[in-house]
């Protein structure tokens, strides 16, 4: 099943009996080890029911994936990665920042290497793209080969903590 956090790291983590499809999709997009995006593909376009069990302790209960939009005002799940990389793209002052952001977004979409998270810093003309360490080199190569004017940097050895749940971005206690 899906827990509110990694039970090996958080002693108060609890099994979630129900997870909405959009929450499960976001968890999979964040590359959480508990759920892969391909698991959800057959579910999203059909009437298939999905029940998730923990491979370590399958008798401890399960999480059912429900096909309704999540409602609420905060995080239900905390997930993390201990080894992520940040690709930084410094847009030259002479370039249109919004246009550069749009171009890079299209390049990454076409290459199917969507980042876990994106930082957009208009004031510094800086774009940041967070990837797992397994994907970062590929994404960096794609951006480098695109030949966009600007400076690319790779920062390694970082960690990412993410919260998943309806309304996380609207809750000032859960989003900064």
Regions found by a protein language model. Name each.
Residues 1-176:
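C-terminal catalytic "cap/lid" subdomain
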């Amino acid at each position: 099943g899906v827990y509110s956090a990694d039970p090996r790291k958080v002693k108060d983590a609890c099994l979630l009996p129900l997870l909405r499809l959009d929450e499960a999709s976001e968890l999979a997009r964040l590359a959480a080890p508990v759920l892969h995006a391909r698991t959800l593909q057959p579910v999203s376009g059909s009437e298939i029911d999905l029940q998730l069990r923990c491979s370590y302790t399958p008798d401890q209960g399960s999480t059912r994936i429900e096909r309704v939009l999540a409602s609420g005002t905060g995080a239900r799940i905390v997930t993390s990665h201990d080894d992520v990389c940040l690709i930084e793209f410094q847009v030259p002052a002479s370039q249109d920042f919004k246009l550069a952001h749009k171009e890079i977004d299209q390049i990454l979409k076409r290459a199917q290497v969507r980042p876990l998270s994106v930082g957009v810093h208009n004031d510094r003309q800086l774009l940041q793209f967070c990837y797992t360490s397994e994907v970062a080199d590929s994404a960096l190569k794609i951006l480098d080969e695109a030949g966009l004017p600007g400076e690319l940097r790779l920062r390694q050895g970082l960690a990412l903590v993410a919260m998943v749940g309806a309304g996380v971005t609207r809750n000032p206690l859960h989003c900064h």
